[in-house]
């Protein structure tokens, strides 16, 4: 059954609060529990040696999506590390944990329907469904949503080790051990792929209640597609001019599967290369220009460019990356 619960934070959660500190009392007003949590975090930051400055403030977030992406797929992170990350996020009022669960280097989601995924793709570690449900609840108690990412159709070496019959070409034999973009890719002409994804995504929704499900969609190398005679024939039969058109065909099929599962598609900015509904959420990693282009086309967007914490930069560098700068107004699409 669908994992959605009443106590899970919603996308447009109300986080605003008012805090008044005088000589004799502290007053915190908020209309939601999450607003109270945010106000208490501010109070903790103001307190020093049992004292806090007299003030009156009204606080509400500028952006409704303030997230952190963790990548345990490439390097497995122990479960307590995920819980600690949620504590840290709550302290600085971040409200979305984007969990990158699958990639060429590993598969970290326990699938009871397709156990070979974690048995062969997660030998270095994976999270049980019980752990992930605990993570979702732990996050909810801190006003944080958890958005899972199942990367498709590329970044699928670990998937291909478990179910090679779903891939565009034979192999791979084992998950990748090195960083990089690898050629393994699902076969978008194989109906068994869509049957597999329908069951897998349904299973994922029983664990993660968030309305968004991230499907990756980035860095899809075309060599396995264009090097397969049956795929080239399929492209010709369906008037798909190139690999970009084939990728768009796959995304459209995947979008329908997500709709049937009651989820909204989210993906990296390459997914805008096809005609997908404007309900799709686009995450830009290639640059601010792709973010503004997607927004101009009517998509909601999330910016990752400029916020890569694995690329050591001064804090000033990150603060210069404004998702909505005043000198670059977005179009009024109302």
Question: What label would you give each PLM region?
Answer:
Residues 1-63:
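Contiguous, structured surface segment used for ligand recognition
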Residues 2-5, 24, 33-35, 75, ...:
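Short, glycine-/Ser/Thr-/acidic-enriched flexible segments
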Residues 20, 61-62, 207, 275-276, ...:
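Extracellular/periplasmic catalytic domains that process cell-envelope and extracellular macromolecules
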Residues 43-45, 85, 300, 319:
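Short, solvent-exposed amphipathic alpha-helical segments in soluble enzyme
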Residues 51-55, 163, 288:
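Alpha-helical scaffolding within the catalytic cores
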Residues 63-263:
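Substrate-binding cleft of carbohydrate-active enzyme catalytic domains
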Residues 108-112, 159-162, 277-281, 314-318:
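Short secondary-structure transition/capping segments
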Residues 264-270, 275-280, 286-334:
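Flexible, acidic glycine-rich loops studded with aromatic residues
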């Amino acid at each position: 059954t669908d994992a959605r619960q009443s106590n899970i934070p919603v996308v447009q959660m109300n986080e605003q609060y008012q805090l008044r500190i005088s000589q004799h009392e502290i007053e915190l007003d908020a209309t939601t529990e999450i607003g109270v949590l945010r106000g208490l975090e501010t109070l903790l930051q103001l307190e020093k040696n049992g004292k806090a400055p007299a003030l009156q403030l009204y606080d509400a977030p500028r952006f409704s999506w303030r997230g952190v992406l963790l990548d345990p797929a490439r390097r497995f992170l122990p479960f307590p590390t995920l819980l600690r990350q949620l504590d840290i996020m709550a302290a600085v009022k971040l409200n979305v944990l984007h969990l990158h669960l699958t990639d060429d280097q590993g598969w970290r989601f326990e699938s009871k329907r397709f156990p070979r995924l974690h048995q062969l793709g997660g030998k270095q570690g994976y999270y049980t469904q019980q752990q992930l449900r605990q993570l979702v609840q732990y996050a909810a108690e801190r006003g944080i949503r958890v958005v899972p990412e199942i990367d498709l159709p590329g970044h699928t070496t670990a998937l291909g080790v478990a179910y090679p019959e779903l891939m565009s070409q034979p192999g791979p034999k084992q998950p990748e051990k090195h960083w990089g973009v690898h050629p393994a890719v699902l076969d978008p002409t194989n109906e068994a792929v869509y049957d597999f994804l329908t069951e897998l995504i349904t299973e994922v929704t029983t664990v993660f209640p968030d309305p968004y499900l991230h499907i990756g969609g980035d860095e899809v190398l075309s060599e396995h597609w264009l090097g397969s005679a049956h795929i080239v024939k399929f492209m010709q039969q369906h008037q798909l001019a190139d690999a970009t058109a084939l990728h768009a065909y796959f995304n459209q099929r995947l979008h329908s599967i997500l709709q049937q599962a009651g989820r909204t598609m989210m993906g990296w900015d390459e997914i805008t290369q096809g005609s997908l509904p404007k309900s799709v959420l686009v995450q830009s990693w290639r640059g601010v220009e792709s973010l503004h282009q997607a927004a101009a086309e009517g998509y909601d967007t999330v910016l990752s460019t400029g916020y890569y914490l694995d690329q050591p930069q001064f804090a000033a560098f990150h603060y210069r990356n404004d998702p909505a700068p005043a000198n670059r107004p977005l179009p009024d699409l109302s």
